[in-house]
């Protein structure tokens, strides 16, 4: 069966970031017949398949206007506080009734590179956990 909606490309910009830097994910998609009310989902998983975070436009009250042809959905993360490693992006497109039209797991990968986030001379690594939580000590 020919799909009416297809994901044509997913790109993470940049492909490699240091802990604490921003990340933008572009989801390019093709709509063969005009429609509206498309909702987009994205999740980030680590190498073990653990879901680190997920976002769904339907939960945020956001859906597409009338679209046809090649279009783009963009999500921007101002700060990615993940510890070093490879992370995978899964994307999905649903219709207004939340029917899953497209779901592609691990369609894109990005790398997080170690950084001395506290200017202490120590690089954080996965012994610090999966994410780095901003904090301040008082002694």
Feature roles, as predicted:
Residues 1-139:
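Localized sequence-composition bias
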């Amino acid at each position: 069966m020919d799909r009416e909606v297809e994901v044509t490309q997913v790109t993470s910009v940049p492909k490699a970031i240091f802990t604490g830097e921003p990340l933008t994910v572009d989801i390019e998609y093709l709509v063969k017949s005009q429609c509206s009310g498309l909702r987009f989902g994205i999740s980030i998983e680590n190498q073990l398949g653990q879901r680190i975070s997920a976002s769904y436009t339907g939960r945020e009250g956001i859906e597409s206007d009338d679209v046809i042809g090649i279009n783009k959905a963009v999500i921007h993360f101002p700060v990615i506080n993940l510890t070093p490693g490879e992370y995978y992006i899964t994307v999905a497109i649903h219709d207004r009734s939340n029917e899953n039209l497209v779901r592609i797991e691990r369609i894109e990968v990005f790398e997080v590179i170690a950084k001395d986030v506290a200017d202490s001379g120590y690089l954080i690594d996965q012994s610090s956990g999966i994410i780095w939580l901003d904090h301040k000590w008082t002694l």
